[in-house]
Amino acid sequence: NLGFTVGNKKYPEQRITLKNTQQVNPDPENLKRIERELAEQITAYRTFSPNTPSNLLLDKPVNGPLSSKFGVRRFFNGEERNPHSGLDFAVGAGTPIKTPAAGKVILIGNYFFNGNTVFVDHGQGFISMFCHMSKIDVKVGQQLARGGVVGKVGATGRATGPHMHWNISLNDARVDPAIFIGAFQP
């Protein structure tokens, strides 16, 4: 038997101030909305199609500087919330967002925290999610080639300005997208 120990990792912290306090401490009506939306998103994250991913070496969905890394501990208005589940790229509103690999659109929506959002199934439990979009340019069921435009960068949902949030889920576990990007090193 081989064993191993998983050690603790200290992630950097990010402190964000939001004017809309509902985005930090939602009222009961918004909590119900968030719960409904989370159920939809969990279903998307748990999608497993038999298609083999076209490539696990992914393109960046946008070209621009990284503004927030995966795993960053987040504090909104001084209150700790979930760690950052993806990568944020600081790019201007309206910048086209391209799918990093071929896939099928499995969910779109306008969500409380994520704003306009698109989920793409790349196959075998490998899912991309793009958030805070100003415009969604795809429909559920649409097949996309690598580099296909899913929408435009925006600042919808819990966002302090235009940026592109991208996360990867592998069999319903959020993983750092940076490990799948060619020569990109955050």
For each of these PLM feature ranges, what is it?
Residues 59-186:
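Catalytic cores of peptidoglycan-degrading enzymes
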